[in-house]
Structures are given as C-alpha cells and as structure tokens.
Amino acid sequence: LKYLSPLEEQSKMILYHHVDTDKLQDVDYQYKPETEILKVAEIMDIWHMAFVEKFDYHMIERYIGTKFDKRACELLYQAVEQYDIFNKLTDGSYYNEFEESVEYVLLSDEEKEKYLRMLMYTTGLKKESMVADTIETIYVCKEIGRKMQLSEMDSAEIYYAALVHDIGTLAIPEDIIDAPRKLEDAEKNLIHTHVELMHKAIEGKFSQNIVDIAVAHHERFDGSGYPKGLKGSGMNTKQAILQTAETVVSMINDKPYRKAYNKEDIMEELNNGIVSGKYDGVVADTFLRYYDEIVEKAFQKAQVTLTTHQRLLRNYEQVYKNFTK
C-alpha cells in the first residue's frame, strides 16, 4: 500500500490493524483513531459470521484497553443503537448501500492505474512468480504493440487488460496452481474458472474494450481456447497481442510441472500455431521477426519493476516476523 497504491498515507492502518492497542501506546502515526475503528469493525465481522445467532457485540468489552481502543468501542455501541448495523449486515442491506456508493467514487487515471497495479501485486503475496509473469506479459505486449505501430489508445487498452488478466487466480487453491504434475480434468476446469472470476470482477468497472481483451487471453484463433472457444473472426488484434504475449512468457519461464522452453522450441510452437491457425498470423509473425529485441527489452524493463516488488516483499516478510514473535 505504501509504495504501490494511492494509499501511501493510510498504509500504516493496514500495517497496525492486527496489533493490540496496548502495544501501540507509544506509537504515534496518522490515522491512528481510524486504525482502531478498523480493528473493531474487523473483529465484529469475524464474530458475527462465526457465532451467528449466539453473537453478542458486548463480547468485546473484556478486551477494551488491551486489544481494542475504548473510544472505538464506544463508537461501535453508538452505531449499533443508531443504525442497527448487525441486522443490516444479516439482511444484506449494506451490500446495496455499498454498490450505490461505489458509483459516486471518482478517480483520476493515475489513481485508477495505481489501484490496478496494487491489485496485480496482491497476486504476488500468494505466489511471487504470478507477479513476474504479469509484469513480463505487460512489457512483451508493449514491445509487440510498438513494432505494430498501435495507437496510444489501443496500447493503453492492452496495458490495462494485461494488468488484470490473471487476478482471478487469487481464488484458485495454491496446491493446484503449484502442482508439480499433470493436472486432473477437474483441476484443469477449476483453473479455467480464473477467467470467469476475473470477468465478474472487472465487468462494468472498465471500458468494454479492456474487458474483451482481458477475458480472451486464453482464447485461440482456431477455437481451441477457453472459456468461450472463440475463433479468429470473433477476435481482434489487441486480443491477439495479449494472447501471444501471455503464451510466450509462459513458455519462457519455468513452471512447477515443466522446465522453461528454449528459444527454438518457442519459435517452433509459434510457427506451427501460425500454420494451424491457432495464433493470429500477423501478431505472432511480428513477435518472431523481432524475437531477440522484444524479449531483451521487455524482460529488462520488467526486471526493474520486479526488483522493487521483491524488495518490498522482503520488507513485508521482515515486518510480519517482527510482529509475530
């Protein structure tokens, strides 16, 4: 949050919201009262779901002054009396209020990009290589687009689609993503749902062009892809660029179930795909003609971003260890 989102000033709220109040008495930082409210709200949500009909918000009283701040708890009591918050949570009223309020949130283009990048980086907390794959895919897309002389608008749409194309994998169990073996059909089908999950998450939040590019990243021009089995006539160059870039990056990198492909194998796969109609001929041929240049530039640029991410991840792990001793 501090380095990779528009929420730099609020980042300590997340850093400290699991730390007991009595351990933070000598720690002064902006948004400290809001952090205490967040802590109370989170535990109320957890208890409300866990205890169901046995839930009683007064349970928090035994922890006032130790785990939770007195003023934050007083605000909780006032909110319960004034707004009937727990009944609204139970009957779903707040979901409608939240959906309505989101419609009035106005963000600049810069803020939108930062939030998207933050969302993309969260995949790295689950599996670091997922962030690497996404960042490398972004830069391969950019280099292919440059060679094809795409407009600034088209390049931007591909960029945003590439940022979010794999966020659905956050919902896929790690033991399946990391499986060092051939997956069962049921497991493959589960992994395939990451596209639909991503689609649901971004539908209505981005322009339809961006959505269409992102949801087609596993489609193939011969109809052999998923989830819809689209064919060439139903797709466009922007979709083909993300498909090609994602395919190339996947082959270049090691996977739990196989070693990385070498250059000759990648070129053979793409050439065969052009002949069979699996890949868009113009896009794939552009990549092949400039293979070395595109890969070198894209991976150099990606490494700069990844170095920053890896440093932040190490810092996160150290902070986590300090607070869990």
Ranges and model annotations:
Residues 1-325:
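Histidine- and acidic-residue-rich, metal-dependent catalytic cores
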